[in-house]
Amino acid sequence: MQGEGYAIPGQVALVLAMGGDHVVAHLALYERNVLLDGEPERMGLIGGVVVRADVRRQGVASRLIEAAHAELRRHGIDFAVLFALDHRHYASAGYVPMQNETCFIEDGHVRRFVYRGGMVAALGARRWTTALLDLQGETV
């Protein structure tokens, strides 16, 4: 990885699935303050989802995502976002493709486009909008 990364002002968690004393799967979860249609919104971002090959197709990733969603709800967060090339793995967890134009800073330059790998899950009663999503800063 190059660059200095970016600051995460909210809570951070690593969700692990254990097989005995070995990690068999994990995901990273953090909160991020963004603007959605110009209005402040705090949302959860999920990334780094990895499941060891010999325990795949056993619902391990689904249980990790359920745990991450529960943690976000506990913090009063209504939306979880992730970026994935293959949407099939996340649809069963309630994720749908995002249609939002997304603004962020990458390598010191402002980027703004619709990223077709973005997915969102509504964790409460509020509905997601297709308005501009401004990530308010750097991404990795």
Regions found by a protein language model. Give the residues of each.
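C-terminal "cap" of GNAT-fold acetyltransferases
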Residues: 104-140
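Conserved active-site alpha-helix within GNAT-family acetyltransferase domains
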Residues: 74-79, 84-110
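Short acidic (Asp/Glu) patches
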Residues: 29-31, 64-68, 99-106
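A short, internal acetyl-CoA/4′-phosphopantetheine-binding micro-motif in the GNAT/acyltransferase core
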Residues: 46-56, 85-86
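A conserved beta-strand-loop-helix scaffold within acyl/acetyltransferase catalytic domains
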Residues: 1-50
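Short loop segments at secondary-structure junctions
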Residues: 19-22, 54, 122-126
